[in-house]
Amino acid sequence: MSSLQRTAPASQAVSLPLEQVKEALGEVLNALQSPTGSARLEEARENSGNDLGKVLQLLLPAAVQIQQEVLQNYGFSADGEGVLRFARLVKSYESQDPEIAAMSSKLKSFFLPPLPLPPHAGLSAPSS
């Protein structure tokens, strides 16, 4: 087991220095963008369509599972709680490091479907 691969009980908080958080975040993004990760997410997106309920049922769990596979190498539990703990840790570093903030924003884009513009967007209001 490498020095980066630690296991921590689910109830134990994992604390990583900024550089290691950046490294883990980079690995998560790479996993989501890998051919396997992309295929899993694309399948979930296609099956979800524009239905937010289906996005929550299909896309979100697929993205969380991909994150879990990476984050357990950094001592986070291999469950949803581990992903939430990592998200809180990332949030705590966002204001300190613009690169982490940008990476975090990119990560969120995998979870949140693009929002369509309302049909009236960009049109001026009718005059009375």
Swiss-Prot record:
Predominant location category: cytoplasm
Top-rank taxon, per record: Eukaryota
GO cellular component: cytoplasm
GO BP annotation list: post-embryonic development
Pfam family, one: P_C10
Keyword Cytoplasm: yes
Family that this chain belongs to: Belongs to the UPF0456 family.
Subcellular location: Cytoplasm
Biological classification of the source: Eukaryota, Metazoa, Chordata, Craniata, Vertebrata
Protein name according to UniProt: Protein C10
Keywords associated with the record: Cytoplasm
